[in-house]
């Protein structure tokens, strides 16, 4: 058992990749597997009795992280320690003991219960598997659990379809408590529920945590849920944790641009908030099959760092960055643009440039910046994407795409070049900046 000073759960360098083109036929045809980096080297710990929130947009890897932490998925790399033991080394009795001490509450209360079983049978299933108590003792324990979660012991013989969504989620929570676990992974436990029911379930989880000394990992995309329940928050983007810290600090003083943008997306009721400046996230989420170099958020970041010596309005620089991203990801079709111009013979280069410029930019440019952008558009008109991309990279490349920032060894770290980075990252930044002089 971990000492009082040690975390109950410790995650170190956890990776979970899924591979495409990796079947037998693909191999016979000589195709290379493509890695989808769902979780890409994350590290954090959870203290006993704590609730850690894991928040981010859909598809960022939150649920995969949770599933891998409880061995519903096997990792590609990294370790998860529970009470000081690497869970991926466990088998036999050791693995069975871990299953007892670690439970899950799933997102969808409608599909997480077997419709052919009564709710009593569903709650008793874990006790049956682990051979806990006699049949009579299991039934009594089940009735106690139903009352703990705000239902009636007399409902033990009813079927799931006889209950509302909120009641079904309470049943799922009762099932998770059946083995008296120390740790529960809550995967979006309220997202499928009406707003009026969400607070009831969250309050229940808090009451149960106090009564049974539980430790939670709460996965959610809803920041209001995170703020209501959690002690600390880890913010996840494209398979990586970009910021982690105490919940009050995260909400009052977010350090990472992605965290700030998430918080800005939360509706504000106060009229004093009208007309406030907002960091709006633009662009599409990159594919985990081919994540961006450097900081994974840099293709959408409102605060992306300009190269030394380049003095532009930040919004104008963001437009150039989006133009570069579209070029690099093949999202500018030269043929379609000529068709839109109505010049299939590709003779009116000026019309091509004007059409594309109107779509890409709302700002005007001057001097060398204008010359580079104009020349890159001209190269596109000539179907020379490689030169167009190189011109933009030479002039507008950011440190954010060259050096990947990391989380500092502090209570509130942020993986961003806008906050102080460790010495080895700072050295890489200086080396790159020296090449730009």
Predicted regions mapped to residue ranges:
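A short, proline-enriched helix->beta-strand linker immediately N-terminal to the Walker B motif
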Residues: 178-182
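Charged, flexible cofactor/metal-binding loops and thiol motifs
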Residues: 4-7, 20-26, 247-415, 419-425, ...
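Conserved ABC ATPase "signature" region
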Residues: 85-86, 136-154, 263-264
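Conserved ABC transporter NBD signature motif
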Residues: 78-89
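P-loop NTP-binding/switch modules centered on Walker-like glycine-rich loops
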Residues: 189, 193, 197-276
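ABC ATPase NBD coupling module
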Residues: 87-103, 129, 250-254, 286-292
């Amino acid at each position: 058992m971990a000492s009082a000073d040690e975390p109950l759960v410790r995650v170190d360098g956890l990776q979970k990749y899924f591979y495409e083109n990796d079947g037998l036929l693909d191999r016979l045809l000589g195709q290379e597997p493509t890695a989808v980096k769902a979780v890409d080297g994350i590290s954090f710990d959870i203290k006993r009795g704590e609730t850690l929130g894991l928040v981010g947009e859909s598809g960022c890897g939150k649920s995969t992280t949770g599933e891998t932490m409880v061995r519903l998925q096997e990792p590609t790399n990294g370790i998860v320690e529970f009470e000081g033991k690497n869970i991926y080394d466990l088998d036999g009795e050791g693995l069975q003991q871990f299953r007892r001490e670690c439970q899950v509450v799933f997102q969808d209360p409608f599909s997480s219960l077997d419709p052919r079983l009564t709710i009593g049978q569903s709650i008793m299933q874990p006790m049956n598997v682990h051979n806990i108590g006699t049949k009579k003792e299991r039934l009594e324990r089940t009735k106690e659990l139903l009352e703990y979660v705000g239902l009636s012991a007399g409902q033990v013989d009813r079927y799931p379809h006889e209950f509302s969504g909120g009641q079904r989620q309470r049943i799922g929570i009762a099932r998770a408590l059946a083995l008296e676990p120390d740790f529960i992974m809550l995967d979006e436990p309220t997202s499928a529920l009406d707003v009026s029911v969400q607070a009831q379930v969250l309050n229940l989880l808090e009451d149960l945590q106090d009564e049974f000394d539980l430790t939670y990992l709460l996965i959610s995309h809803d920041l209001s849920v995170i703020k209501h329940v959690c002690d600390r928050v880890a913010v996840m983007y494209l398979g990586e944790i970009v910021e982690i810290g105490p919940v009050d600090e995260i909400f009052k003083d977010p350090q990472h641009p992605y965290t700030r943008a998430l918080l800005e997306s939360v509706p504000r009721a106060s009229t004093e908030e009208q007309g406030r400046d907002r960091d709006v996230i633009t662009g599409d989420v990159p594919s985990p099959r081919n994540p961006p170099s450097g900081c994974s958020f840099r293709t959408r970041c409102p605060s992306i760092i300009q190269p030394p010596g380049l003095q532009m309005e930040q919004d104008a620089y963001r437009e150039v960055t989006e133009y570069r991203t579209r070029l690099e990801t093949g999202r500018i079709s030269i043929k379609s643009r000529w068709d839109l111009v109505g010049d299939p013979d590709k003779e009116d280069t000026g019309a091509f440039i004007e059409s594309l410029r109107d779509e890409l930019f709302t700002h005007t440019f001057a001097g060398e910046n204008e010359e580079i952008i104009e020349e890159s558009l001209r190269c596109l008109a000539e179907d020379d994407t490689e030169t167009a991309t190189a011109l933009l990279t030479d002039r507008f490349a950011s440190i954010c795409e060259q050096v990947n920032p990391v989380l500092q060894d502090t209570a509130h770290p942020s993986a961003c070049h806008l906050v102080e980075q460790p010495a080895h990252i700072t050295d890489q930044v200086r080396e790159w900046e020296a090449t730009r002089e």
